[in-house]
Amino acid sequence: TCEKATFNIIGKSGEDFSYLPQIERSDSILLSQFTLKEVIRQTIFSIADNFTNKILTGELFEINGNLLKVVSSDGLRISLRRIELKNTYPDKKVIVPGKTLNEISKILSGDADKDVNLFFTDKHILFEFDNTTVVSRLIEGEYLKIDNILSADYETKVKINKREFLSCIDLSLIHISE
């Protein structure tokens, strides 16, 4: 028992903290949690981790009709993932901070039967899924023009079986280590 003990708890008024911005919940982009989690997993590794170029610390989310293109780059590597959406949406380009995507990836269940709604304003993105709402500021600026870097007119194009190729790489790594 505490009987005569007294405690002083120091706190701040709720008015000292900023409120979440009001984001109109119309025209949402709908994705499955599994798809969003996979897209983040497949692109997050090539985000720049320094602040010399703030734009490269985020990922470009570009919507053209029923196609979502997610791009990240650290200046040396480029990750590009295209997803065909179920519906058609107005064209939009935003740069989502990598830290936000990393946190989203941790709390998504990855269930293919559950959806995520993405809402955009000029300065914010809102992720809404299950009973969770995440709001983040967008990175302002123009992302790299990836289409200029990755042209489609290659002199040589090779199509390979991914599993066989990875198996050969694993085998060569065994020989190298010996």
Locate the predicted segments by residue.
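Structural preference for solvent-exposed beta-strand-turn elements
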Residues: 1-177
